[in-house]
């Protein structure tokens, strides 16, 4: 599933190309994605100017000049790409937005776990994103904030940093990578972390996410940006997907365990604490 770096990459690839354009037509090829698409989607943003393209957590947001926003979640296999005017519709193209410059914005999703909504812009944080935690790059992510969230939690730290009510945008890949960089065992209980470990973890999360964004995200199978290009952070992964291989820091063997049904990768030597 695309995480923060992939959605940030998607935003960066689309923003300058979309701002100022108008949605001239919306075609719903299939309305039963993860949730049924509202027929209002074809009218609420029609003939409106795109003001901004931004990200919140793992959601892409397109703001329009009529005070509505389009919210897109890629799910497991979603792709949201710009295509030329002569683009031929593909099998899993579910929503097609015709743009005023002749191009098309296509939402394609093989597994249909993606979501698209239209929502009043000024109500997004209060009603749509009301359960979300803070952004990893926010100044609000401090030792005090994370310590407060962890002090009563007797669950593995990996589960905690993947909790979108605490910190948004961190999924399986970047949780494993961040904990390896911070040298923290993924099974360590959140309330057992020392202050210096929490500070190291915050720094590691930001460092890993920054490098991933710079590399265009991680493409394991489906992810591409708005220009239909894959991400290359896969080549920089230190532990994720490397079970049985040598740790790139110490040459010990990378181990895979399960957390809540998800695969977790770590180095028993580097991540001893």
From Swiss-Prot:
Its cofactor is Zn(2+). It catalyses: Hydrolysis of DNA containing ring-opened 7-methylguanine residues, releasing 2,6-diamino-4-hydroxy-5-(N-methyl)formamidopyrimidine; 2'-deoxyribonucleotide-(2'-deoxyribose 5'-phosphate)-2'-deoxyribonucleotide-DNA = a 3'-end 2'-deoxyribonucleotide-(2,3-dehydro-2,3-deoxyribose 5'-phosphate)-DNA + a 5'-end 5'-phospho-2'-deoxyribonucleoside-DNA + H(+). It comes from the Bacteria. It holds the Pfam family Fapy_DNA_glyco. GO terms for biological process: base-excision repair. The keyword Ion transport does not apply. The keyword DNA repair applies. The active site is at 2 (schiff-base intermediate with dna), 3 (proton donor), 58 (proton donor), 262 (proton donor). DNA binds at residues 92, 111, 153. Binds 1 zinc ion per subunit. A zinc finger (FPG-type) spans 238-272. InterPro entries: DNA_glyclase/AP_lyase_DNA-bd, DNA_glyclase_Znf_dom_DNA_BS, Formamido-pyr_DNA_Glyclase, FPG_cat, MutM-like_N-ter, Ribosomal_uS13-like_H2TH, Znf_DNA_glyclase/AP_lyase, Znf_FPG/IleRS. Keywords: DNA damage, DNA repair, DNA-binding, Glycosidase, Hydrolase, Lyase, Metal-binding, Multifunctional enzyme, Zinc, Zinc-finger. GO terms for molecular function: 8-oxo-7,8-dihydroguanine DNA N-glycosylase activity; class I DNA-(apurinic or apyrimidinic site) endonuclease activity; damaged DNA binding; zinc ion binding. Its EC number is 3.2.2.23, 4.2.99.18. HAMAP family: Fapy_DNA_glycosyl. Belongs to the FPG family. Involved in base excision repair of DNA damaged by oxidation or by mutagenic agents. Acts as a DNA glycosylase that recognizes and removes damaged bases. Has a preference for oxidized purines, such as 7,8-dihydro-8-oxoguanine (8-oxoG). Has AP (apurinic/apyrimidinic) lyase activity and introduces nicks in the DNA strand. Cleaves the DNA backbone by beta-delta elimination to generate a single-strand break at the site of the removed base with both 3'- and 5'-phosphates. Monomer. This is Formamidopyrimidine-DNA glycosylase. It comes from Rickettsia africae (strain ESF-5). The gene is mutM.
């Amino acid at each position: 599933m695309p995480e923060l770096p992939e959605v940030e990459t998607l935003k960066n690839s689309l923003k300058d190309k979309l701002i100022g354009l108008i949605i001239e037509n919306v075609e719903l090829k299939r309305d039963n994605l993860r949730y049924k698409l509202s027929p209002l989607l074809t009218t609420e943003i029609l003939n409106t100017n795109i003001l901004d393209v931004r990200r919140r957590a793992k959601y892409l947001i397109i703001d329009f000049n009529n005070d509505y926003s389009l919210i897109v979640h890629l799910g497991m296999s979603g792709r949201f790409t710009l295509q030329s005017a002569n683009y031929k519709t593909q099998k899993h193209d579910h929503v097609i937005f015709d743009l005023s410059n002749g191009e098309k914005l296509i939402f394609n999703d093989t597994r249909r776990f993606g979501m698209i909504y239209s929502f009043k812009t000024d109500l997004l944080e209060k009603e749509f994103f009301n359960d979300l935690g803070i952004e990893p790059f926010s100044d609000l992510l401090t030792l005090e904030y994370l310590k407060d969230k962890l002090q009563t939690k007797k669950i593995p730290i990996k589960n905690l940093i993947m909790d979108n009510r605490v910190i948004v945008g961190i999924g399986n890949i970047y949780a494993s990578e961040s904990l390896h960089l911070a040298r923290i065992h993924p099974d360590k209980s959140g309330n057992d972390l020392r202050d210096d470990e929490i500070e190291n973890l915050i720094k590691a999360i930001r460092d890993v996410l920054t490098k991933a964004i710079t590399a265009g995200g991680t493409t394991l199978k489906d992810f591409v940006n708005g220009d239909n290009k894959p991400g290359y952070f896969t080549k920089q992964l230190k532990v994720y997907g490397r079970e049985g291989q040598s740790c790139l820091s110490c040459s010990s063997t990378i181990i895979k365990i399960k957390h809540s049904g998800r695969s977790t990768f770590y180095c028993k030597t580097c991540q001893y604490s």
